[in-house]
Regions:
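Membrane-proximal, glycine/serine-rich, low-complexity loop/turn segments characteristic
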Residues: 1-4, 21
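Transmembrane beta-strand segments of outer-membrane beta-barrel domains in Gram-negative
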Residues: 8, 12-14, 20-187
Length: 187
């Protein structure tokens, strides 16, 4: 026992009276948290309650500048070591972003390459890990405390091993399901 199932819905509607311009965002997410580490021996986690996390989500955004669909899937583990260290390890993280009806003047107004990249189709398959340390892990700390978090994400490197068999789009990017895949390491 001890499994947790979560189901979330979200919605956002923006409009002005007597103005035809509207913005809509809708989303759904589901998650299953299992109180053990699947596919890894539990004896490695004797002093804590490890959990396996499986999550899936969908988000739809319709704005005057663009329409975007986002699909996410993740599989991972979280556990703690003692009272102060917490760990998340996600061997599988996948995000698919499909953008259409992009307003060209809106896109051209984006000067920052990071922002421009947020408005492109993208297939992101990778892994991630987080280590979190705190001097007070209580739910409601009574005193000042310190915390530090270190996160790493890596994507696309395994996919790059198959570059020779992947199709190429008009920009020269390798694609999966007609969508360029991301390749990066960030910390």
């Amino acid at each position: 026992g001890g499994e947790w199932f979560t189901l979330g819905f979200m919605g956002n509607f923006q409009f002005k009276l007597n103005d035809p311009i509207r913005s809509t965002e809708l989303g759904i997410s589901a998650g299953l948290s299992i109180p053990s580490i699947l596919f890894i021996p539990d004896k490695l986690f004797i002093t804590n309650v490890p959990r396996t996390e499986i999550n899936i989500g969908y988000n739809y955004q319709n704005r005057p500048e663009f329409t975007r669909n986002l699909i996410s899937l993740s599989y991972g583990y979280n556990w703690r070591s003692g009272e102060r260290f917490f760990y998340n390890l996600y061997p599988l993280q996948m995000n698919i972003i499909n953008l259409y009806n992009l307003n060209s003047s809106f896109y051209e107004s984006l000067k920052d390459p990071f922002l421009r990249n947020a408005y492109r189709n993208n297939f992101d398959l990778g892994s991630g890990a987080t280590v979190y340390y705190t001097t007070d892990a209580s739910t409601i700390p009574q005193n000042s405390f310190f915390y530090a978090r270190w996160t790493n994400d890596i994507a696309g490197n395994v996919l790059s091993l198959f570059n020779s068999s992947l199709p190429v789009d008009t920009t020269g990017a390798r694609t999966i399901w007609n969508t360029p895949y991301a390749q990066y390491f960030r910390t």
